[in-house]
Amino acid sequence: MKTIVSLTLFFLLTAGSYAQSIKASVKDLSFMAGTWTLKHKWGDMEEFWGPPMGDNMVSSYRCVKDGKVVFYEFVVIEQTNGVPVMKMRHFNPGSIGWEDKDKPLSYNLIALTKNKAIFESADKQVKLTYQRLNPQKMNVVLNEKDKKGVWQTDVFNYTLKP
């Protein structure tokens, strides 16, 4: 019985520390910096990432189809409790927000390797992966569970704008 209790405590403590074990700085995400472009079925996309400045990074994004904006995004990554946390908002034309004003979408950094960062929503329904493939290419992979709980994947193959 003592062994079972000890093992249970060990697994609970290990699982809790694993979830909080990633330590990273916003500076570790500097590989994302640049102006990235892509022609996609949704439209022409442009995603700008400013380099880290202090404890944060910022991004703006636009998708334009047939000369008309489809939607915008504004993103910040801020150092929060030792880990970069992404906050995202979407906007229709006219700067009409999708999310409530006090509730941006939030994604915690869950994995970081050289030139690759994975962010995940608190409800674990969305993962965003940023991977710098080479000096001119970066993939952004959106993995999202649909209403049936099945993962859907969109890959955005960006090229660095000269």
Kindly give the residue locations of the regions a language model identified.
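Central antiparallel beta-sheet cores of small beta-barrel/beta-sandwich binding domains
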Residues: 44-121
